[in-house]
């Protein structure tokens, strides 16, 4: 049970890190257009159909999310 919690905690940290990296790369590309800043709230971010996914079963996350592979399972991350 402790190993599962450890992997889920790692998955959450990985998802947050990836989301921040994606947001940072998007911000770097559009730094010239300061008038077009859009701040997304949790209500604007799409919900995934499932929190966990597998690369062997495509489509578990839904249309607006993608699967981030981890050592055992993957996690669904919203496409922002």
Curated annotation (Swiss-Prot):
Q: Which residues form the signal peptide?
A: 1-27
Its job:
Neurotoxin certainly responsible for the defensive, persistent, and painful stings of the giant stinging tree. Inhibits inactivation of Nav1.7/SCN9A sodium channel in sensory neurons by directly interacting with TMEM233, a newly described Nav-interacting protein. Has virtually no effect on Nav1.7/SCN9A function in heterologous expression systems and in neurons that do not express TMEM233. Also weakly but significantly affects Nav1.8/SCN10A. Coexpression of TMEM233 with Nav also confers ExTxA sensitivity to Nav1.1-Nav1.6.
Q: Name a single GO biological process.
A: defense response
Coiled coil feature spans: none
Family from the record? Belongs to the gympietide family.
* Species of origin: Dendrocnide moroides (Gympie stinging tree)
What other facts are recorded?
Answer: The name 'gympietide' is derived from the name in the Gubbi-Gubbi language for the stinging trees (gympie-gympie).
Disulfide partners: 48-65, 53-67, 61-76
User: What's the entry's take on its domains?
Assistant: The presence of a 'disulfide through disulfide knot' structurally defines this protein as a knottin.
Keywords attached to this Swiss-Prot or TrEMBL record, sorted alphabetically, are: Disulfide bond, Ion channel impairing toxin, Knottin, Neurotoxin, Plant defense, Secreted, Signal, Toxin, Voltage-gated sodium channel impairing toxin
Q: Which residues form the propeptide?
A: 28-44
Q: Can you name this protein?
A: Moroidotoxin A
């Amino acid at each position: 049970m402790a190993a599962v919690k450890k992997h889920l905690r790692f998955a959450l940290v990985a998802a947050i890190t990836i989301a921040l990296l994606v947001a940072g790369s998007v911000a770097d590309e559009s730094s010239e257009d300061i008038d077009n800043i859009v701040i997304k709230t949790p209500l604007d971010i799409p919900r995934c159909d499932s929190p966990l996914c597998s690369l062997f079963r495509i489509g578990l996350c839904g249309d607006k999310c993608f699967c981030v592979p981890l050592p055992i399972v993957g996690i669904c991350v919203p496409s922002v």
